[in-house]
Amino acid sequence: MSLEHGAIWTEQLEVSKNFYVKFFDGVPKEKYTNEKKQFQSYFLSFQSGARLELMQMVGVPANTNDRVVAQHQGIIHLAFGVDTMDQVDEKAKQLANAGFLILSGPRKTGDGYYEFETLDPDNNRLGVTTFFKES
């Protein structure tokens, strides 16, 4: 069995789509629109085969959890894997230079990964990770 896709509600569908395309090489399918429900979405595919659905609909309330400082029950982040620690460092620099907050790292974790954590345009937590390798 495999995880088919994850989904994120957003108030800025095009901004979110462009973020995942530009920084994470997501490949969008054509926008789906249901005018009756005032719903729109994109499915983005990634090199690994994973997919992410970005959704927007009138009336969906904003997330009131503090996703920057606090942790909460439920899904807390998405992680993107890269091949090398240099790629982790490069992606952190690219996002920081584009104005995105780096919450932590790049750093070695206690369970053998090298990663950093950032936020997407909707303040959803994202990680970029690889296995730690001694130099």
Task: Mark where each language-model region is.
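Short, flexible helix/strand-to-coil boundary loops that buttress conserved ligand/catalytic motifs
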Residues: 20, 56-58, 92
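Vicinal oxygen chelate
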Residues: 2-12, 42-46, 65-135
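Short catalytic micro-motifs in class I SAM-dependent methyltransferases
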Residues: 5, 24, 127
